[in-house]
């Protein structure tokens, strides 16, 4: 835990007692703050009270006495309308921050020189974050991994000299971190997302820009127009910018040339790493993630050889284009995290012959945007509520069956793929749908896929059964 000592003996109001909010309350108390916490969920309040956290409806506190208001990132700050606690804090002139801001202040107070890499972007954040942490750990560095990737940042070990922090930041967390100042800040890309919480694309982009604008080194993907403009603007403001691209050469930075990463420096184009054969980094989207990781690790002093070794040994992330098993020429891929068509596209673009398991609770737009990848699909196996809709979209372009259940889809796809005479093929769960019609969440769906694959005869598992761990 990181005790928040910068608020010792100060009164702090806190709203939101979910996972990160609960951890934040404990970190504040450990640092000596006088915390008053609340949540709209009575069960969360009861749990906090049972753990010794002082709880009180924030309608009734004296806001003029509060040094700070700490808001959980899942609570609306501006859109669709500010949460009632936000209105109360603003009316009293109390600053509003989140857990990442508290971490930033503790680092600044106790170990301002310890390397801190922050990662954001619409897509690829978690893979890039995990890859950077893996490279650092593999190279022998004391590495702390947290943030939006699933480990609350204040549950990490406290800042000290020589300790490296790798923190994934959502737009909500950045919005609540006004003094965010990483050693290296990464903005991977920007496409419309979370506009219900940010109002406009411009506001969403402005929030993301703050992370790189406050960085010592800004690493920016320039393959979309919003991010390219941000790179130019931040550079004009005097920040060192390293540009990355998966599509085009850059004058200075890291870019992908097919499956190779190239470092552009001082007018020279130097081959840096070959991603061929690294199953967990297949696809052009992962080339961009790898380019960002390379740039960040170079920025904090990791040697080129250590970075290459880390790339080659990266185990990947659960449920994200994750090779889980192999039988003969057929690889089985868990991409359960692909909960919409855009998220499924990278996996479909990364294999040439696919037995595709898709469906679940459909999202608006269905799978029409995936038509360019239909020639790669040998057959589709449709499950869940989306089956009929997806069947209509596939029409005569792709052979399909309505399997109904994931277990049946895995069995049928595996049998068909085994009969395929192609040199290599993939049985892939990349549902392009939410899971809630059949599973509690995408993780449970992915674990079910792993279990069904593990039950097949003659299977060589690449991970532990139903755990997704190497």
Curated annotation (Swiss-Prot):
Give the principal location in a single coarse category: cytoplasm
* Keyword Cell membrane belongs to the record: no
| A family per Pfam | Mur_ligase_M
Database matches in InterPro entries: Folylpolyglutamate_synth_CS, Mur-like_cat_sf, Mur_ligase_C_dom_sf, Mur_ligase_cen, MurD
Q: Per the UniProt entry, what are the Gene Ontology biological process annotations, in alphabetical order? A: cell division; cell wall organization; peptidoglycan biosynthetic process; regulation of cell shape
Q: Where does ATP bind?
A: 121-127
Write out the GO MF terms.
ATP binding; tetrahydrofolylpolyglutamate synthase activity; UDP-N-acetylmuramoylalanine-D-glutamate ligase activity
- Into which EC class is this enzyme placed? ligase
EC number of the protein: 6.3.2.9
Q: Spell out the family assignment given in the record's similarity comment.
A: Belongs to the MurCDEF family.
Supply the name of the protein: UDP-N-acetylmuramoylalanine--D-glutamate ligase
């Amino acid at each position: 835990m990181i005790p928040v000592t910068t608020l010792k003996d100060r009164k702090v109001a806190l709203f939101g007692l979910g996972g990160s909010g609960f951890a934040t309350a404990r970190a504040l108390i450990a640092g000596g703050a006088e915390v008053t916490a609340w949540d709209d969920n009575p069960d969360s309040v009861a749990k906090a009270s049972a753990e010794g956290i002082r709880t009180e409806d924030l309608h009734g506190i004296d806001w003029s006495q509060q040094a700070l208001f700490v808001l959980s990132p899942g609570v609306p700050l501006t859109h669709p309308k500010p949460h009632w606690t936000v209105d109360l804090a603003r009316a009293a002139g109390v600053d509003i921050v989140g857990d990442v801001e508290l971490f930033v202040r503790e680092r600044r107070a106790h170990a301002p020189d310890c390397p801190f890499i922050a990662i954001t972007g619409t897509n690829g954040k978690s893979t890039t974050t995990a890859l950077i942490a893996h490279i650092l750990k593999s190279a022998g560095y004391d590495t702390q991994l947290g943030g939006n990737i699933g480990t609350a940042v204040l549950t990490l070990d406290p800042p000290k000299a020589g300790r490296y922090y790798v923190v994934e930041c959502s737009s909500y967390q950045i919005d609540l971190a006004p003094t965010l100042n990483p050693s290296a800040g990464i903005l991977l890309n920007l496409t419309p997302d979370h506009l219900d919480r940010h109002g406009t694309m411009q506001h969403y982009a402005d929030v993301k820009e703050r992370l790189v604008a406050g960085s010592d080194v800004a690493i920016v993907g320039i393959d979309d127009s919003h991010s390219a403009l941000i790179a130019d603007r931040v550079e004009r403001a005097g920040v060192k910018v390293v540009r990355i691209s998966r599509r085009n050469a850059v004058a200075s930075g890291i870019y992908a040339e097919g499956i190779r990463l190239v470092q552009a420096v001082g007018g020279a184009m130097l081959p840096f790493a070959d991603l061929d054969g690294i199953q967990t980094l297949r696809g052009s989207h992962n080339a961009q993630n790898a380019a960002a990781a390379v740039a960040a690790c170079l920025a904090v002093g990791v040697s080129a050889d250590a970075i290459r070794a880390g790339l080659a040994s990266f185990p990947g992330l659960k449920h994200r284009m994750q090779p889980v098993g192999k039988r003969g020429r057929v690889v089985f891929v868990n991409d359960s995290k692909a909960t919409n068509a855009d998220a499924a596209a990278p996996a479909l673009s990364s294999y040439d012959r696919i037995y595709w398991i898709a469906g679940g609770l459909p999202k608006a737009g269905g799978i029409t945007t995936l038509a360019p990848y239909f020639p790669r699909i040998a057959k589709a196996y449709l499950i869940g509520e989306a089956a009929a809709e997806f069947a209509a979209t596939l029409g005569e372009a792709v052979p399909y069956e309505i399997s109904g259940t994931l277990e049946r889809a895995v069995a049928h796809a595996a049998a068909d793929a085994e009969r395929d005479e192609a040199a290599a093929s993939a049985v892939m769960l990349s549902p392009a749908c939410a899971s809630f019609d059949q599973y509690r969440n995408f993780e449970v769906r992915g674990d079910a896929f792993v279990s069904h694959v593990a039950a097949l005869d003659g299977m060589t598992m690449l991970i532990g059964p139903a755990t997704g761990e190497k």
